[in-house]
Amino acid sequence: MSLSNKKTQKIASDLLPARLSQARGDGTLDLLITNVQMLDVITGDIYPTCIAIGGEHIVGVGMEYQTQSARRTWNALGAFVTPGFIDGHLHIESSMMSPFEFEKATLPLGTTTAICDPHEITNVLGGRGFSWFLRSSELMHQNLFVQMSSCVPALPGFETTGSDFPLEEMKSFKDHPSVLGLAEMMNFPGVIHADEEVLAKIEAFDDLNMDGHAPLLRGKALNAYLLAGIQNCHETVTLEEGREKLQKGMGLIIREGSVAKNLRTLAPLVNEFSSPQCLLCTDDRNPFEIAHEGHINYLIKELINKHGVAVHVAYRLATYSAARHFGLKRLGLVAPGKKADLVFLKDLKAVDIQEVMIGGKFVSELKLQDSLQEKLQTSQPPLENTMKRSPLTEKELTVNLLPGVYNVIEIVPHEIITQHLTVAFDGQKFAESDVLYMANIERYGKGLPPALGLVKGMGLKSGALASSVAHDSHNIMVIGTNPADMVLAVNTLIKSGGGFAVADQGEIKALVELPIAGLLSLKSAEEIKDGIADLKTAFRSLGVHLDEPFIQMAFLALPVIPTLKLTDRGLVNVTNFSFIPLQVEA
């Protein structure tokens, strides 16, 4: 399929007569699939059928094709067939994989389409990072759509980024076939209060999809946000919040990532009536969980087996509902004229995948591994060192505490929101346990001093954890029990070009290097997964009880998610978007 047809996935005009001939039964099919059980995600019916394929498209569905001549016939051996799965919102950078490695990891799991927002790499490298994702999408079998990163930085004036992404530069990418519209508009206060710069972006992309980001937004504020043209939200964390958003016509993108897990809370809202307005996403999911649990296939399985959602409804969310929401009219159904993106399953409830097809080709025959390095080289990933910071000293990361009361960030397990605590310190110890030192360190050569803070809920008993992944500006975040190990972990990342580090008693216990913008690895998914396993072993030995502390850490810097966050410029009270001091003023 030509790149220009990517959004519409339409059949090229010069091929249409041949496809019509195949559909009528006159022409020889390119592929005939027999002995297959159709799961109809519209009616909920399951019935035996044949699927006739010409080129990249389905030309017919029905038993009447079983005797038609075909260049190749494939017996599905009674397998069930569904449309390919669609991830409605994700940041590939959170997988730590290149787009090509992400494709290799998730396409065999049934994810034939992914709608991504590369605002992580865009915060670091600006348009150069964004354009790399566009170049990558052109080389992939998987349908990778790249939404236009709308908030770089997430909250201007509150954090330091490596680059910006001004409207004029955004417009230059608007007509690229991989761009569906505007990515999550995180600056919801700017929308609601008619910020000129924010409204200019909305106006420029009003003719395309516009994704939302509105945690806990309700009432008149939600009305104003929707009035501006925002279409969906993947940040819904309560049942009643989700119900109100559905009632007001907002697309409810139900998220189950590595940290933010909203499936259990929002699943009761999913039924036959609401399902056209509900879809699924992973948002931020690491390679360890992708390998051990799955991707969108995992979300479908959880909906069916843990939350009692009807089988056809669960699959509808992952296919037709998502395609319809984003205007991808040739995707999301097993029907004539649709792109032949198909998932064949031995068991629908277990989501036991037998084979996956993309554009009429079996994924098992694509040899994705063989072309990976060639694609990576062709796409020209940005490999310059983005850790533009001199090594730190212990003095710079020493939090000098006097007796008093301090503002403390409390981690909420499996959520990216935090709680705002005030905790007393008597000069020797805190009134509450598990309070640790933290710092956010600007890494883009601006020379800003580290911002210091306190955090509760990590469980760390010794040592330090440091990361160059700290949403969304991706400065260096470190949490530790002592300045020496904190400095060691941070300086190791500065030297290595970014990644994750665990330090204890003067030694680096584990290190995962992320040389592409301090966010992505050049290694395979298997190698990254093994590195994550080593990190887990290291931080577990130091007492950390969180499932994904590095992902949890990364969101402690994001000042558009409630309630208290630490950017490289200081503590941010997200309730009223203001800086506050570490020590509570008397």
Curated annotation (Swiss-Prot):
Annotated signal peptide: none
GO BP annotation list: adenine catabolic process
Gene3D superfamilies, A to Z: Metal-dependent hydrolases, Urease, subunit C, domain 1
Coiled coil segments of this chain: none
Keyword vocabulary terms for this entry: Hydrolase, Manganese
Top enzyme category: hydrolase
Catalytic activity: adenine + H2O + H(+) = hypoxanthine + NH4(+)
Essential cofactor(s): Mn(2+)
InterPro entries for this protein: Adenine_deam (IPR006679), Adenine_deam_C (IPR026912), Amidohydro-rel (IPR006680), Metal-dep_hydrolase_composite (IPR011059), Metal_Hydrolase (IPR032466)
GO molecular function, one term: adenine deaminase activity
Domain of life assignment: Bacteria
Protein biosynthesis as UniProt keyword: no
EC number: 3.5.4.2
Family named by the database record: Belongs to the metallo-dependent hydrolases superfamily. Adenine deaminase family.
Protein name: Adenine deaminase
Species in which this protein is naturally found: Bdellovibrio bacteriovorus (strain ATCC 15356 / DSM 50701 / NCIMB 9529 / HD100)
Lineage of origin: Bacteria, Pseudomonadati, Bdellovibrionota, Bdellovibrionia, Bdellovibrionales
